[in-house]
Regions:
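Bulky hydrophobic segments
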Residues: 2-173, 178, 192-216
């Protein structure tokens, strides 16, 4: 009898675990699907043309709007981060077990690149963030400052990273580690530096091209 109960407990555990891992990804997809449904209904899309209208609207905006393309790339990369860090993660029974770990390249004598990955992960994110929302974050002036650019990127990434770590802690989806928060934030700061350097280079090229045109 005890063996049968153990088997049923194991089956129930595996089933619940299999359902829990993709739970938040399923919630997000369901939310987006219902948003599309409401949008289509408000615009009078018919059911038999719903998919075609959806892709036609998306493609039209993608071709005509640079802001839409930038925001799409940011949303895509953000989804990739969430899938790696929160969505579809295994359950950790002790999310605070390694709160002060993960600083070096070796853990228990085993080489690991987790710290480097956490650093690199948010460099493209902060670049895409500033690229998509430069006016909203840095103002509408023709030139942007180095300090403000790096500070805004660092602050947004720090808050976003903390929300990820807190979600992992709250729902036992990974471990809460101060090192993750630190390396993610540093990556965001470096992304801000790279964006500023790219912005300055682009601005200098524009000024140079204007000078060449005025000479002719």
């Amino acid at each position: 009898m005890g063996k049968i109960i153990e088997i049923f407990n194991r089956i129930a555990y595996n089933v619940l675990l299999a359902l829990y891992q993709p739970f938040w990804a399923a919630v997000l997809l369901a939310f987006l699907a219902m948003f599309l449904y409401l949008y289509g209904r408000e615009h009078g899309w018919k059911k038999n043309n719903f998919i075609r209208n959806m892709f036609a609207t998306w493609w039209s905006s993608f071709k005509s709007s640079s802001n839409f393309r930038r925001t799409f790339l940011l949303a895509f990369y953000t989804a990739m981060i969430l899938l790696r860090t929160v969505l579809n993660r295994e359950i950790w029974f002790d999310p605070l077990g390694k709160i002060f770990g993960g600083w070096g390249l070796y853990e228990d004598g085993v080489f690991t690149t987790e710290s480097i990955e956490n650093f690199i992960l948010f460099i493209p994110f902060s670049i895409l963030l500033l690229w998509a929302f430069q006016q909203e974050l840095l103002g509408e002036s023709k030139s942007i400052g180095f300090g403000k650019t790096v500070w805004k990127a660092t602050k947004v990434v720090a808050v976003f990273s903390f929300m990820i770590e807190f979600t992992q802690l709250l729902f036992h989806l990974g471990t809460f580690q101060i090192s993750d928060l630190t390396y993610n934030t540093l990556g965001g700061a470096i992304g801000g530096v790279i964006y500023y350097l790219g912005y300055c280079r682009k601005r200098k090229n524009k000024i140079r091209n204007r000078g060449q045109l005025s000479e002719h």
